[in-house]
A protein has these predicted regions:
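Intrinsic low-complexity, intrinsically disordered or marginally ordered coil/linker segments
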Residues: 1-166
Length: 166
């Protein structure tokens, strides 16, 4: 018996295999409003409390997520990579669940801008971003943007990126 309330994805194609997975992908890619002014938030915005980068040590899938808040202009872009997430959409779901718990709901919405993999070595202060997301597709500039964000947020880190590989 399969639990259709748990998102399932194809290991080879990244395709959503059940209704829960399809709903998660739709949520992650929908944009009721698309913000082009990422980072220009009101001074009192709750989004200013959100860490811009969270990376698990090791090599894992990552997603680049644009966050907005209902009733506010502006947006932030965050990078998330969790060791417990097998799929890019799982990283999105984990981030949104975490934000809901930390911020108490507060009308925060997320939209996946892209994803790939990140090799993170905290000990040597290195991060390398590469590949793409089978679920969300190739997104030009995504890996470069993620690497720039990581380098900006992680002081003293050496970062690199490539669009090669999966």
């Amino acid at each position: 018996m399969t639990d259709h309330s748990i998102p399932r994805f194809c290991e080879h194609t990244g395709e959503a295999l059940n209704a829960a997975a399809l709903a998660l992908v739709r949520e992650a890619t929908s944009a009721e409003r698309v913000e082009q002014n990422a980072g220009k938030l009101p001074e009192d915005s709750i989004l200013k409390k959100v860490p811009i980068v969270k990376l698990a040590p090791g090599t894992w899938k990552y997603v680049l997520i644009q966050l907005t808040r209902d009733g506010e202009d502006g947006a932030i872009v965050v990078v998330r990579s969790y060791a417990h997430c097998a799929f890019h959409a799982d990283n999105f779901a984990a981030c949104m669940r975490e934000l809901k718990e930390e911020l108490g709901g507060k009308g925060v919405r997320g939209r996946v801008l892209g994803g790939g993999r990140v090799r993170h070595d905290a000990e040597s202060k290195r991060a390398f971003v590469y590949g793409y997301s089978k679920t969300f597709g190739r997104t030009p500039g995504c890996n470069e943007r993620a690497a720039v964000i990581i380098e900006r947020e992680f002081d003293g880190y050496e970062t690199g990126w490539s669009d090669d590989g999966y």
